[in-house]
């Protein structure tokens, strides 16, 4: 694993430190300031002639990003999470330590420098070292600065290296953290209670998706990694909670692309005595809050598309197919005509699709990618909405919406189905679809129906994909860019890469 000649040279240097009685992985030394705090505290030191006060001693730590040896002195660029700070080490102050430094120190090593602030001839605020310690000897060379780490596969597989070499990557994940905490704060301010529900389910439910299957040794039963928390959250509404939310992982054993990862983060929230129209207004408030928190304008650019949050619209499913998709009502309202139209347009249609699923195929192909500004699409076909409430005026549609931004689904919400008999029938229909070969159809969940039979108040519920939300608000083009360790196809590891030195 460590046979590479450059790695062997570094291992030799680590062993050489040990021979000098120095631990190359020293512990217990503390910094007094972050690099950013040092730069702020001593910003007034701007001139080489500034009096040097050795009493103002600080300890800073970080990774060596640049090393310039110049005879009896050296300059070292040291990076911690907050900033890059320059250290100056001279043989005059550190005779033996300086000789050891010249012999052993390399780019990538993690160090501690204790010293006082001073400015170089060029006016750069730096640390004049009085003590120097290697805290962690790096035995694998980092990619050279000029070429960086551009191999996209390697960036995802070795995210730690990506974070070291590409500073902008840290910024994305700091923004992700801010987005998640802001979403949580928003719902707490709106009076919602954060809860946690099981990650392993006896019956997969809450979404149409293939589950991952595992085995519980103690119970001697199969369990499914959850595809959605919906049915458990609605059980809590039955139990008397009126506004709950959960931010956590879902797992779907399906394909991967730039906007899908089998393990992903969602927020789902349920609101008793409210309707899907209330959720639309709540969603608008959420985005207003996020844009303000992130200091973003109401117009953002994503994938070369201008998204204007001041141009939010609401449109029904059939109206969207007609006015945006360009399909006439005469075709949309007749199942045989719609099927013929899809085939004429070259859409690959699975055999025996229901009318509702044909409409969904048409929507996916002719509408979704055109929805750039925030668009709430309402009145979905009941056949593709097995958990949503049936509309009072038209039993063929559901009181449901999906929110699309920049051509992608961001949220799905509806007035919840709380009629246990209707829910039982719909589960039976889903089971029939599964028996016909639809692997994504939902399972029968009698326990959930039994819970509904105890009475669930009128409720609205919604899910928002956190990863896609982060993509939108950071401009990331791939979901892998906003997940620290995304799912990757297995490869044979070859760690003996050539050094960039």
Swiss-Prot record:
Gene3D superfamilies: Bira Bifunctional Protein, Domain 2, Nucleic acid-binding proteins. Mg(2+) 2 binds at residue 409. Its EC number is 6.1.1.6. InterPro entries: Aa-tRNA-synt_II (IPR004364), aa-tRNA-synth_II (IPR006195), aa-tRNA-synth_II/BPL/LPL (IPR045864), Lys-tRNA-ligase_II (IPR002313), Lys-tRNA-ligase_II_N (IPR044136), Lys-tRNA-synth_II_C (IPR018149), NA-bd_OB-fold (IPR012340), NA-bd_OB_tRNA (IPR004365). Keywords: Aminoacyl-tRNA synthetase, ATP-binding, Cytoplasm, Ligase, Magnesium, Metal-binding, Nucleotide-binding, Protein biosynthesis. One of its GO terms (molecular function) is lysine-tRNA ligase activity. One of its GO terms (biological process) is lysyl-tRNA aminoacylation. Its main location: cytoplasm. The gene is lysS. Its cofactor is Mg(2+). This is Lysine--tRNA ligase. Binds 3 Mg(2+) ions per subunit. Homodimer. HAMAP family: Lys_tRNA_synth_class2. Mg(2+) 1 binds at residues 402, 409. One of its GO terms (cellular component) is cytosol. It is found in: Cytoplasm. It catalyses: tRNA(Lys) + L-lysine + ATP = L-lysyl-tRNA(Lys) + AMP + diphosphate. Belongs to the class-II aminoacyl-tRNA synthetase family. It holds the Pfam family tRNA_anti-codon.
């Amino acid at each position: 694993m460590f046979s590479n000649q450059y790695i062997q040279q570094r291992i030799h240097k680590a062993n050489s430190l040990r021979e000098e009685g120095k631990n190359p992985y020293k512990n217990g030394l503390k910094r007094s300031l972050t690099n950013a705090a040092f730069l702020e505290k001593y910003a007034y030191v701007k001139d080489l002639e500034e009096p040097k006060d050795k009493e103002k001693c600080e300890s800073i730590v970080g990774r060596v990003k640049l090393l310039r040896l110049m005879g009896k002195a050296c300059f070292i660029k040291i990076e911690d999470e907050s900033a890059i700070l320059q250290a100056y080490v001279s043989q005059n102050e550190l005779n033996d330590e300086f000789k050891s430094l010249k012999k052993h120190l390399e780019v990538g090593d993690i160090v501690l420098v204790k010293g006082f602030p001073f400015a170089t001839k060029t006016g750069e605020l730096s640390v004049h070292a009085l003590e120097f310690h290697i805290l962690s000897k790096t035995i694998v060379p980092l990619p050279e600065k000029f070429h960086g780490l551009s191999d996209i596969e390697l960036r995802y597989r070795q995210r730690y290296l990506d974070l070291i070499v590409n500073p902008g990557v840290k910024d994305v994940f700091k923004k992700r953290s801010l987005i998640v905490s802001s979403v949580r704060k928003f719902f707490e301010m709106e009076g919602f209670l954060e809860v946690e529900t099981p990650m392993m389910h006896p019956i997969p439910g809450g979404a149409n998706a293939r589950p991952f299957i595992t085995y519980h040794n103690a119970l001697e039963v199969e369990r499914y990694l959850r595809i959605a928390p919906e049915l458990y959250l609605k059980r809590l509404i039955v139990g008397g909670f009126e506004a709950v939310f959960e931010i956590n992982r879902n797992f779907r054993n399906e394909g991967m692309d730039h906007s899908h990862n089998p393990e992903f983060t969602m927020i789902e929230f349920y609101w008793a005595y409210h309707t899907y129209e209330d959720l639309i207004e709540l969603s608008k408030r959420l985005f207003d809050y996020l844009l303000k928190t992130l200091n973003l304008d109401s117009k953002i650019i994503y994938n070369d598309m201008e998204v204007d949050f001041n141009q939010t619209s609401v449109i029904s499913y059939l109206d969207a197919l007609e006015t945006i998709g360009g399909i006439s009502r005469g075709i949309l309202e007749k199942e045989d005509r719609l099927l013929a139209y899809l085939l004429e347009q070259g859409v690959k249609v699975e055999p025996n699709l229901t009318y509702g699923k044909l409409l969904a195929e048409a929507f996916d192909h002719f509408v979704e990618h055109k929805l750039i500004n925030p668009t709430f699409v309402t009145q979905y076909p009941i056949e593709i909405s097995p958990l949503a409430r049936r509309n009072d005026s038209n039993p063929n549609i559901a009181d449901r919406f999906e929110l699309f931004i920049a051509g992608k689904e961001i949220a799905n919400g509806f007035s919840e189905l709380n009629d246990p008999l209707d829910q039982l029938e719909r589960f039976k229909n889903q089971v029939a679809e599964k028996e016909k070969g639809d692997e994504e159809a939902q399972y029968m969940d009698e326990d959930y129906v039994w819970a509904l039979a105890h009475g669930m108040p009128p409720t609205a519920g919604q899910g928002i994909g956190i990863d896609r939300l982060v993509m939108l608000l950071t401009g990331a083009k791939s979901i892998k860019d906003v997940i620290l360790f995304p799912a990757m196809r297995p490869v044979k590891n070859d760690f003996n890469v050539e050094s960039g030195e």
